[in-house]
Design a protein with these regions (language model features):
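N-terminal basic, amphipathic alpha-helical segments
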Residues: 1-119, 132, 312-318, 330, ...
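Conserved glycine-rich beta-strand-loop-beta hairpin in the small C-terminal domain of fold type I
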Residues: 343-354, 362-375
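Short glycine-rich anion-binding loops that position phosphate/pyrophosphate groups of nucleotides
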Residues: 100, 223-226, 286, 414
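Conserved core segment of the aminotransferase class I/II
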Residues: 280-343
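Conserved core of the PLP fold type I
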Residues: 119-249, 261-274, 434
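Residue-level detector of anion-binding/catalytic polar loops
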Residues: 64, 171, 192, 252, ...
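Generic structural signal for small/hydrophobic residues in well-ordered secondary structure
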Residues: 51, 95, 134, 148, ...
């Protein structure tokens, strides 16, 4: 029979499937309360143990969470839904995407000739000359490069590592606010997110210490160009974080240096300085093009073996054609000059909007990268208000776990000449919002 909650089923599997279907379809939204075990058991005519088993399976899969006396509720970002942004309305200036400016990307031209002969893809999955380039790229910035591997992008690599290292129900420390696709990925793997607060210098050491006390088995962070907040590790913050992390040598530290060359900040890596388990991940999508689904990683020996062992059982290797293209671009003098120009351009655009907002008394954060985070009282009011002025920005809800509200503005394609108008419109919207919602 169906209950007032729309839940049906006579077996644990059937009940769990019914709840999952309701969450997927939206009839049970994020943080909606599920009925107590005994009440649902009575309504369905089954034993409490059957309902408890269904709830346990739903928790394992990241669809619901238990809040002590607060009962069982749908997860804030359930694994069967997505934090994908809404479609951009026609006629608006889109500052929500976080993508690089296409005019600052090189042309992607396939190599004119591939080396002849049969390639031993499984025995030699990585081009030796690309490995050498990667070591020369990452090593001088202080990351140990004895062990290097490749993957089909940062999310692919991080997801593979977490699935090998952790089990459903394990806890992962994640930046808050943080990159929404990573948050979705962790939830989809059935892992529990432990939010870690960030500021302009990245992860806060006190918040990391709290996450370690909560029993996290991995920590995922960005050393610079933190998305969406824009923070980057200072030298002092790096040392403070290492002091905290060295106390838990079994925790895997995953460093996602996604913007590297165009972040506008130096790398202060947590890797290779007393940590036992670590991986430093880099992609090229922000400065060579989003179609290049390739990532390089430097890591400890154990992490390398576990990652490559799982990769071998799935896709096996990253396309050598793709590796050839990446190698060609990373070693091309003209491309390197374009990347340098892109980094300078993004820094100029980011600084221009920060200055214009600050000049109007609007607090904003963006020490590095392509995004600004602006704290607000009401995300919907600000997003819709800016829409009326012709701008489309990202509501912060999809980036947040427990942090205060805000909006993300991508500055990658925002010319400095437009920054003043956006800041003026933002100030007007904030004034209207405070008048409407009581300040």
């Amino acid at each position: 029979m169906a209950t007032q909650y729309g839940i049906t089923g006579t077996t644990a599997k059937g009940i769990a499937a019914s709840v999952e279907r309701a969450v997927t379809e939206g009839s049970l939204g994020p943080e909606a309360a599920l009925p107590p075990v005994r009440r649902l058991a009575d309504d369905l005519g089954v034993s409490p143990g059957t309902v408890a088993t269904a709830y346990k399976e739903l928790r394992r899969r990241g669809i619901v969470v238990t809040r002590g006396r607060g009962g069982t509720v749908v997860a804030p970002a359930p694994a069967v839904t997505s934090r994908r942004p809404p479609k951009v309305p026609e006629g608006l200036r889109d500052l929500s995407g976080g993508h690089p400016d296409p005019s600052l990307l090189p042309a992607l031209v396939p190599p004119s000739r591939l080396s002849p002969g049969v390639r031993a893809h499984r025995s030699m999955p990585r081009l030796a000359r690309l490995e050498e380039v990667v070591r020369d790229w990452i090593g001088p910035e202080g990351v140990p490069v004895e062990h290097v591997t490749f993957a089909h992008g940062a999310l692919d690599l991080i997801g593979r590592l977490l699935s090998v290292e952790l089990r459903p129900g394990d806890a992962v420390a994640m930046e808050d606010p943080g990159y929404h696709h990573l948050l979705d990925l962790v939830t989809a793997l059935g892992l529990r997110i432990v939010p870690v607060a960030v500021d302009d210098e990245g992860l806060r050491p006190d918040a990391v210490r709290g996450a370690l006390r909560a029993g996290v088995r991995a920590l995922v962070c960005s050393p610079r160009a933190q998305n969406p907040y824009g923070g980057c590790f200072s030298a002092a913050r790096r040392e403070a974080l290492l002091e905290v992390l060295r106390a838990e040598p079994d925790v895997l530290v995953v460093e996602n240096d996604h913007a590297s060359e165009v972040s506008g900040a130096p790398l202060r890596s947590l890797t290779g300085d007393g940590l036992t388990r670590w991986v430093h991940v880099r992609t090229v999508s922000k400065f060579l093009g989003t179609d290049l689904r390739w990532a390089a990683a430097a890591c400890d020996a154990t992490t390398l073996a576990r990652h490559d062992g799982r990769l071998l059982l799935t896709s096996g290797w990253v396309s050598h054609l793709l590796q050839e293209i990446v190698h060609g671009l990373l070693t091309d003098v003209a491309t390197r000059a374009l990347v340098t120009a892109a980094q300078e351009t993004y820094a100029l655009r980011r600084g221009a909007l920060l200055a214009e907002l600050g000049g109007r008394g609007i607090d904003a954060h963006g020490a590095s990268g392509m995004n600004l985070w602006v704290p607000v009282q009401d995300e919907s009011a600000v997003v819709n208000g800016l829409r009326s002025y012709g701008w489309w920005v990202a509501a912060g809800a999809r980036f947040r776990s427990s942090s205060p509200p805000g909006v993300r503005i991508s500055v990658a394609a925002l010319a400095p000449a437009d920054a003043a108008r956006l800041a003026s419109d933002f100030a007007a919207v904030l004034g209207e919002s405070e008048a409407t919602y009581g300040g």
